[in-house]
Amino acid sequence: LFPLLSLTVQRIADHTVQDKITLGGNICGTIIYKEGLLPLLVSDSYAVVADYRGLRNIPVKDIFQRELKLNEEEFIVSFVIRRCYTELPYLHAKRTKSDKINYPLITLAAILEGNKVKMAFSGLCRYPIRSVTMEDWLNSSSLPEALRIQYALKSVPDFILEDLEGSASYRRFLLESMLHEVSSKLGV
């Protein structure tokens, strides 16, 4: 079992199929949040992809870049997560407008590998993201925490989402708070 994945998918943001969706359904579906993808991104997981030639393992980060990058004849059979990632310290945080099970303003999944944090977000942009640049800034131990967080905030790789759930400035405020939480709870 992968505790971070279990925790993240418990509160999937899809009102139409609550408690009935598979991990593959969440990731391959049309909803933009795809929260089930976050733990797979931070754990450098692989997707087992099938097509007419057989099965192959593809890094999750390679088949999901802003959107799912599968050919028409391909489908995901399963995911491979190295055991070492299932035992690392982790943090899951979800901020919603009103309810525990709702579309996220931001969902965060983070793990601490060695003394480096890896983190992925849903609801921050129009698609789930893992930004190595944001991680590098947050992991820059030579800088004070406040400066690391400010540089990480400036490194969000795309426009911050603005929709009926919340404004871009509010999401940025939440992101800053969540980065402080990552720093304090995972000790970076």
Give the location of each predicted region.
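C-terminal structural segment of proteins
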Residues: 1-188
